[in-house]
Every structure is written in structure tokens, then in C-alpha cells.
Amino acid sequence: MTQTIFMVGARGAGKTTIGKALAQALGYRFVDTDLFMQQTSQMTVAEVVESEGWDGFRLRESMALQAVTAPKTVIATGGGAVLSSENRAFMRDHGRVIYLRASAAVLAKRLAEDPEEAQRPSLTGKPIVEEMLDVLASREALYQDVAHHVLDGTQTPSLVVEQILQMLTGEMVK
């Protein structure tokens, strides 16, 4: 198997943590689209949103997704990458999509503990638990629609990676 693996889910779901571990287990390259955008634009996510608005950020996100897609690559997508129907079609057509699902309470707790959180702009201006409830309510169907596999992102990263490896091995046998 050499296809691209896309990790989708809300902020704090574990896409980067699990994506890195999965890439290491597979001998793949790992790319985080938010980090890629920051490196190529020389701006933080907050700075891109401030200067170009959310539409500009989403456009950059789509371009980054296409730019980093390559065989033997695990990609941690931005939480909102699924908002674009073009992004959803692109990911489904170019690899396997894994949705890391977690409750709003778990996501809020992880984000509150994340030192990078300060550079991520609020999507709604609400407290983080309320924001995550809103985000999940508006995106859950999109995450489900794009995903080839849905996994419980609240488990330990090693367990999630093990489950992904088993799923991918099972697909190769079919």
C-alpha cells in the first residue's frame, strides 16, 4: 500500500499526534496542512485569518491539501478542510480518509491544555466547550461523509494506530 492517508476531525481530535505515529509505523512521510501553510505563508493561522479572512484561509487550506498529497504520506488536515465539497472529493479520490471522532468535552479539554491554542483564532467567539459543540454539530455529517473509516479518537494514540494498521492490512487482503 502506498496511498495517501488523510486524517480528519475537529481541532484537538489527535490528527497530528496519531498521524505522526502512524506515519512512523508505516515508514511514510507526515505532513500537517496547518503547519505547511504557516511555513509557506510565513504567517500563523491567526495572522492568515486576520489578513485574508476565513475565506482566504480556507482557500490556502485547499491549496495546501493538494500540494502535500503524495504517495506514502499521512496528512493531518485542518479541522475545517471538510467544509469544502471539493476537498472532500479530493481526499476520497486520492487516498484513505480516517475520521478521529471525539466528544466536545474531550476536544475542549485537549485544546485548553494545548500551548498552540493561543495562536488559533476562535471560530465562533464562544467559550471553547460551546464552540466545540457548535463545530461538531455543523461538521459531524461532513466528517462521516468523507471518511472511509471512523475511529474513537479518545483512545490512546498507540491503540488508534494499531486499529488503523489492522484496517489498512485488511483492505490490502481484500
UniProtKB/Swiss-Prot annotation:
<feature type="region of interest" description="LID domain">
    <location>
        <begin position="112"/>
        <end position="126"/>
    </location>
</feature>
<dbReference type="InterPro" id="IPR023000">
    <property type="entry name" value="Shikimate_kinase_CS"/>
</dbReference>
<keyword id="KW-0460">Magnesium</keyword>
<dbReference type="GO" id="GO:0000287">
    <property type="term" value="F:magnesium ion binding"/>
</dbReference>
<dbReference type="GO" id="GO:0004765">
    <property type="term" value="F:shikimate kinase activity"/>
</dbReference>
<comment type="function">
    <text>Catalyzes the specific phosphorylation of the 3-hydroxyl group of shikimic acid using ATP as a cosubstrate.</text>
</comment>
<dbReference type="InterPro" id="IPR027417">
    <property type="entry name" value="P-loop_NTPase"/>
</dbReference>
<feature type="binding site">
    <location>
        <position position="79"/>
    </location>
    <ligand>
        <name>substrate</name>
    </ligand>
</feature>
<dbReference type="GO" id="GO:0005524">
    <property type="term" value="F:ATP binding"/>
</dbReference>
<keyword id="KW-0547">Nucleotide-binding</keyword>
<dbReference type="Pfam" id="PF01202">
    <property type="entry name" value="SKI"/>
</dbReference>
<feature type="binding site">
    <location>
        <position position="16"/>
    </location>
    <ligand>
        <name>Mg(2+)</name>
    </ligand>
</feature>
<keyword id="KW-0057">Aromatic amino acid biosynthesis</keyword>
<feature type="binding site">
    <location>
        <position position="34"/>
    </location>
    <ligand>
        <name>substrate</name>
    </ligand>
</feature>
<dbReference type="GO" id="GO:0008652">
    <property type="term" value="P:amino acid biosynthetic process"/>
</dbReference>
<keyword id="KW-0067">ATP-binding</keyword>
<feature type="binding site">
    <location>
        <position position="32"/>
    </location>
    <ligand>
        <name>Mg(2+)</name>
    </ligand>
</feature>
<keyword id="KW-0418">Kinase</keyword>
<keyword id="KW-0808">Transferase</keyword>
<dbReference type="InterPro" id="IPR027544">
    <property type="entry name" value="Shikimate_kinase_2"/>
</dbReference>
<feature type="binding site">
    <location>
        <position position="155"/>
    </location>
    <ligand>
        <name>ATP</name>
    </ligand>
</feature>
<comment type="similarity">
    <text>Belongs to the shikimate kinase family. AroL subfamily.</text>
</comment>
<keyword id="KW-0479">Metal-binding</keyword>
<protein>
    <recommendedName>
        <fullName>Shikimate kinase 2</fullName>
        <ecNumber>2.7.1.71</ecNumber>
    </recommendedName>
</protein>
<comment type="subunit">
    <text>Monomer.</text>
</comment>
<keyword id="KW-0963">Cytoplasm</keyword>
<keyword id="KW-0028">Amino-acid biosynthesis</keyword>
<feature type="binding site">
    <location>
        <position position="58"/>
    </location>
    <ligand>
        <name>substrate</name>
    </ligand>
</feature>
<dbReference type="GO" id="GO:0009423">
    <property type="term" value="P:chorismate biosynthetic process"/>
</dbReference>
<dbReference type="InterPro" id="IPR000623">
    <property type="entry name" value="Shikimate_kinase/TSH1"/>
</dbReference>
<dbReference type="InterPro" id="IPR031322">
    <property type="entry name" value="Shikimate/glucono_kinase"/>
</dbReference>
<comment type="pathway">
    <text>Metabolic intermediate biosynthesis; chorismate biosynthesis; chorismate from D-erythrose 4-phosphate and phosphoenolpyruvate: step 5/7.</text>
</comment>
<feature type="binding site">
    <location>
        <position position="139"/>
    </location>
    <ligand>
        <name>substrate</name>
    </ligand>
</feature>
<dbReference type="GO" id="GO:0005829">
    <property type="term" value="C:cytosol"/>
</dbReference>
<dbReference type="GO" id="GO:0009073">
    <property type="term" value="P:aromatic amino acid family biosynthetic process"/>
</dbReference>
<feature type="binding site">
    <location>
        <begin position="12"/>
        <end position="17"/>
    </location>
    <ligand>
        <name>ATP</name>
    </ligand>
</feature>
<feature type="binding site">
    <location>
        <position position="120"/>
    </location>
    <ligand>
        <name>ATP</name>
    </ligand>
</feature>
